[in-house]
Amino acid sequence: MPEKILGLDIGAGSVKAVLLSRGFFGAHRILGVRRIDIRGPGGVPEALALLFADPVYEGATCVTALPADRISFRNIRLPFRGDRRIRQTLAFALEPLTHQPLNSVFIDYLVSSQDVQSEIFAALADRSLVGEWTELLSPHTRETAVIDVGAAPLAAFLLRKPDSHACTLVLDVGLRDTTAIFTAEGRIRHIRHFHFGGEKATQAVAETLRMDTAAAEALKKAGDIPEPAAASVRAVCDPFLSELKNTQRFLFDQGRIPSEISRIILTGGGALTPGLAERLSRTFAVCVEGTDLITSGNYEMEHALRSSWEPAILDQALALATRPMGKGRGFNFRQRESVTAGFGGLDGFLKKGAA
């Protein structure tokens, strides 16, 4: 019987859900798509209750992701190869580099490059945060199989494509935050969080044109805003672009990316901000692309669902639903996974089987 997988993208402003049936021979059927705004004091729990009130979403295995701004990232080099030796040593190597007690976090990692040595990109998540996420979902899902990080599943999906070896910047622009993922040679090299989102552009339009935020958001989405408002949007975008450019320079100088960015992929609800793609292209002197994962896979879906599909908003949830369950290119902080002794004496600090 085909397995039902629910990709659940929980953002600052809304919950996005894509329900997928994984069949044989790589076929996927999309059974449901929802976007529910997070409003009022009920917050995320209320939005989830509304989602799961629809019986079509019951009994699914859930794949979700922690917000990138709640995760600590570290780059570290180890003088050997091999997953077992990395797992045995990593917690000790990270201890001097973090202000968090290691018995309060889960650690997972990706190998960002490897020859005789291993370049490790590690992520540390508070155990309390992982527990909070698991508790939030446990009343509604059959199992939370994967808890990844931010837009990493979307970047990993794009890395499956044959043109993924170029030095690429994947930008997921949300309501209040942006996750930037730098990839090169088919691997995730770095993840950085920025305090910039589509809400800043909406506020700039509202203040310039002296209208309420709902009207400003509708005008922004229509894409045809008067020049004074467009100038205000550029003014709030430019500090973010400058910070992003400085991050690229730092990563290149540190040898964490092999070259300057040659490709930018822009997604997320805030990616629809008028003028953002053009200013990104001008800042980095590269073309800026959007995402549309539906066109790059074997997906079946009803016409009504297809006609309402918004790639920039829903692609992250789809990437979660299609994420491999086993060890792969993503992080996995699933709390259900048992830990074993033998990780350099720091038993349980580093979870088993980094995904």
Task: Label each residue range with its predicted role.
Residues 1-355:
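Hydrophobic/aromatic-enriched cytosolic interaction surfaces used to assemble or bind macromolecules
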